[in-house]
A protein has these predicted regions:
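Membrane-embedded and interfacial regions of multi-pass energy-transducing membrane proteins
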Residues: 1-280
Length: 280
């Protein structure tokens, strides 16, 4: 999980400063926290085995290390929030997905603290609480960030622009549908509903019904988002070769055409500013 989320962190760290028109806050802190998460990710595997008969000492060690992941993760969250603070935030499709990521991944991270505590994990292990936590981190984190990245670099990569109104509606649908699908599963887990069961007690039917309904909304929203991207090919809504719709200042936006040439640059680029110097 920790390794798969790292590329998403990079995407979000690119989207937020561009669409906030502000230099990213704490660049070095974000970079070092990424290395920290990559390292700590190799040391926390034991928190999945609290119910397997581990020694008390092992449980304490793995629980402590698991909590440690929250420090560099919190550094990233607060750095992104401070980047937006007093910035010129534009609610473009990429930014909508970035904001969704911040909310969903934060919930995923906070609920992971419960599973890192031995006393709580004994009761929550292999319940729907784990299912909800996992999806808030993986889908609410990795996939939502990936969708944001697609919408951010789509006009640059393919030279066509999608319908931004439809993209924003789809992004909102993904956010609402996702929470409607997986938040009830936290409640199911807290009530003792085990995962991997096709049949279950009547007391769980109502929450399962909510989750099933909103999963349809989530699926439809993702379908609309993807089809909107591919429709831009069919409609051939081409952008100007030198187009920079988001006002990005990194090399792919300032020194390449849309889409880029096979070797990116027609000539050696001359740097006249930093990649995030929006205040200059």
């Amino acid at each position: 999980v920790y390794i798969m989320i790292l590329p998403a962190f990079g995407i979000i760290s690119e989207i937020i400063p561009v669409h906030s028109r502000k230099k990213i806050w704490g660049y070095k802190f974000i970079a070092y926290s990424t290395l920290s998460i990559a390292f700590i990710g190799f040391l926390v595997w034991g928190h999945h085995m609290f119910t397997s008969g581990q020694s008390v000492f092992s449980q304490i060690v793995f629980s402590f290390i698991t909590y440690f992941v929250g420090i560099p993760t919190g550094v990233k969250i607060f750095s992104w929030i401070l980047t937006m603070y007093k910035g010129q935030v534009s609610f473009t499709p990429p930014m909508m997905y970035a904001l969704s990521f911040l909310f969903l991944f934060t919930i995923g991270g906070l609920t992971g603290i419960f599973l890192g505590a031995v006393a709580l994990d004994i009761h929550l292990h292999d319940t729907y609480f784990v299912v909800a936590h996992f999806h808030y981190v993986m889908q609410g984190g990795t996939i939502v960030a990936f969708l944001g990245g697609l919408h951010h670099w789509w006009p640059k990569s393919f030279g066509v622009m999608y319908n931004q109104t439809v993209a924003n509606i789809a992004a909102l649908g993904v956010f609402i549908g996702f929470n409607g699908t997986f938040f009830p599963q936290f409640l199911l887990g807290l009530r003792g509903m085990p995962r991997r069961y096709a049949t279950y007690d009547e007391q769980f039917v109502e929450l399962h019904s909510y989750s099933t309904f909103w999963s349809g909304i989530l699926g439809i929203s993702i379908f609309i988002a993807v089809m909107n991207l591919f429709w831009s090919f069919i409609k051939k809504n081409k952008v100007d070769p030198g187009s920079n719709p988001w006002g990005g200042m990194t090399l792919e936006w300032t020194h390449t055409s849309s889409p880029p040439h096979p070797h990116n640059f027609e000539e050696d680029p001359v740097l006249q500013h930093g990649p995030y110097d929006y205040d200059k």
